[in-house]
Design a protein with these regions (language model features):
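Conserved phosphate- and dinucleotide-binding cores of soluble alpha/beta proteins
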Residues: 5, 15, 19-21, 29-32, ...
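N-terminal active-site beta-alpha-beta segment that forms phosphate/nucleotide-binding
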Residues: 2-164
């Protein structure tokens, strides 16, 4: 999938090629499920991976919580400016995004900005089985608090396989590395939703959240990163 060049202070294209083997961020090894020794190694590796992800999540959440209202507002405005530049530069008119939770980059500015910039804006709704369905945003009255307290579309008729027909998909992240590997909240909603997605996928983070992240084979690799610089 093609990606835009790095532009200005806020867009970042994940690096191509293989990761540096010297990186101390854990990777999930492949072990045979038929070998008891390998089973033990696999279990230990999975536990180490879970702990590594938990540490990164805790660190990023603490940093977000520590931001003053003034700094948060400035960073959110810069994030939305980066999103605006990307959408305009690429000529995107049909996109999917999300309503950020408290303290997530972009804040309350993200959805209104994308609604102004595009002709179609689709938002996710959480469903049982950790699945996402998608509904078209049609103003504040078209959304309500969902099962996790996040604003979701009242009507979400589309399954995630429709995302490939859009111009781009904006994705929340705790952190993302320079390869495009994303660390999410841990429930796996987006790993399922974006599997095989043909549309360009965009991580939305603060610049300090572009960092090495532990990842596993099922973790989604994103195409573009936007941040506050």
């Amino acid at each position: 999938m093609d990606t835009p060049p790095v532009s200005g202070f806020s867009q970042h294209t994940p690096a191509n090629g293989h990761r540096d083997a010297s990186n101390d961020v854990p990777h999930a090894p492949a072990c045979s499920p038929l070998d008891p020794v390998s089973d033990g190694l696999q279990a230990a590796a999975e536990a180490a991976m879970a702990q590594a992800k938990a540490r990164v999540r805790a660190r990023v959440r603490a940093a977000r919580t520590a931001l003053s209202p003034k700094v948060r507002a400035e960073r959110d405005a810069a994030v939305v400016a980066a999103v605006t530049t990307l959408v305009q530069d690429r000529g995107w008119s049909r996109v999917a995004a999300y309503a950020p939770m408290a303290r997530e980059p972009g804040g309350s500015l993200l959805v209104p900005a994308l609604a102004r910039l595009t002709t179609e804006l689709w938002l996710p709704a959480c469903r049982p089985g950790r699945m996402l369905r998608w509904g078209r945003y049609a103003g504040p009255g078209s959304v309500c608090a969902g099962m996790w307290g996040i604003l979701e579309p009242r009507d979400a008729p589309q399954e995630s396989d429709f995302l490939g027909s859009l111009d781009g998909v904006f994705v929340p992240a705790i952190a993302v590395d320079d390869q495009g590997f994303r660390l999410g909240q841990g429930a796996g909603f987006y790993d399922r939703a974006l599997a095989g997605c043909a549309a360009p996928t965009v991580a939305v983070v603060y610049a300090s959240e572009i960092m090495p992240v532990p990842h596993e084979p099922h973790d989604v690799m994103l195409d573009i990163i936007v941040s506050d610089g």
